Amino acid sequence: MGESIMANSTYVISATAQVNAPPRRVYDTIANYHTGHPRILPKQFQNLKVEHGGIGAGTVITFQVRMLGQTITFRAEVTEPDPGRVLVETNVKGSDSVTTFIVEPGDRPDSAMVTISTVFQRHPGVSGAIEKFVTERVIQPMYAEELRLLESVAASDEQGRA
């Protein structure tokens, strides 16, 4: 379901799942920060607010993540390097992590393969190794839940990008 790759001073946590909904609808659900994206967030993600835009590239959001007894506030800018297929959230507050959503056609016309992956900065030493170990075990289940919620939302309605 997911993987962790070590590369230099970063590591990646990702999860991939087949979503039983058309790729366009899946992508539009992810890209719509007004009505789609809020409905796919696991309970650890709270207070998602759109500061600017709200549909795909140019969107600026703030949100909080509660895990391990702490709440961290994030601010992220959204880009679409490959609109309709790749959406990227680059954190500019709270963390320097970058999360990428990739939507590809599934094995049927009405399905999509979706990957959520985040690149984290690795901190040096033992504390960095512990942080990576804990982060992997906390984030993996959150991404699995987000993919389950995405399937439920995208399969049940049509979000649209307008």
PLM-predicted stretches and their roles:
Residues L48-S95, S111, G125, E145-A162:
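Glycine-rich portal/gate segments that line the openings of hydrophobic small-molecule binding cavities
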Residues G2-H52:
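Hydrophobic ligand-binding cavity/cleft-lining segments
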Residues Y11-V12, P22, F63, V88, ...:
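Residue-level detector of alpha-helix boundaries and kinks
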Residues V19, V65, T118-F120:
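Hydrophobic beta-strand positions in extracellular immunoglobulin-like domains
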Residues N20-R24, I55, E80-G84, I102-M113:
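A short, structured loop/turn motif at beta-sheet edges
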Residues A15-A17, F74-E80, V98-P105, T118:
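Hydrophobic/aromatic beta-strand elements that line small-molecule binding cavities or substrate pockets
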Residues V88-E145, R161:
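Beta-strand/loop substructures that line and gate deep hydrophobic ligand-binding cavities in soluble
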